[in-house]
Regions:
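His-Asp phosphorelay/catalytic-motif detector in bacterial-type signaling
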Residues: 3-4, 30, 50-54, 78-83
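Conserved acidic segment of CheY-like receiver
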Residues: 4-15, 20-24, 55
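Acidic, metal-coordinating helix/loop segments flanking the phosphotransfer/catalytic sites
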Residues: 35-54
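Active-site residues of response regulator receiver
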Residues: 57-58, 88
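Receiver (REC) domain active-site loop signature in two-component systems and cognate sites
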Residues: 61
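Short, glycine/charged-rich "phosphate-handling" switch motifs in NTP-dependent
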Residues: 105
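CheY-like receiver
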Residues: 119, 126-142
Length: 142
């Protein structure tokens, strides 16, 4: 049995954390979700391990913004390969461009409907599972 897909969810809003955890709970044992309420807490957890398969990071947080956390992740050689999805209420092109300039893997806009969020989480889980299970037979002599 393969291990569950590990998600680190970082958001300073307890209501958003709770709602997202409910969305993730629909995946049952396929996902494990850890949460952090600040960027500082998230960086500490990432450096201690275990590494998540994806970090979902709120953009607008006090003290350390999501952009600052993303920059710190990408500046750390031990963390830079972790995919980071930015989650924000802003759909401003400048915010989206900044996220991708800092090497975010994806940028999702928060909305009243979390269906798109669920769909994107499903896509990450599917990609992760398929990328770790070869779909081709081993070649003789390799």
């Amino acid at each position: 049995m393969s291990r569950p897909f590990r998600v680190l969810l970082v958001d300073d809003n307890p209501a958003d954390l709770m709602l997202a955890q409910e969305v993730f709970a629909e995946h049952g044992e396929r996902l494990t979700v850890s949460t952090c309420a600040s960027g500082e807490e998230a960086l500490g957890r990432l450096r201690r391990g275990p590494m998540p398969d994806v970090v979902i990071l709120d953009v607008n947080m006090p003290v350390m913004s999501g952009f600052e956390v993303l920059q710190a992740i990408k500046d750390d050689p031990a963390l830079l390969s972790i995919p980071v999805v930015m989650l924000s209420t802003s759909s401003q092109p400048g915010d989206i461009a900044r996220a991708y300039t800092l090497h975010a893997s994806s940028y999702m806009v928060k909305s009243n409907s979390f269906q798109k969020f669920v769909d994107q989480v499903d896509a990450f889980v599917t990609f992760w599972r398929e990328s770790r299970t070869p779909s081709w037979p081993d070649r003789p002599g390799s």
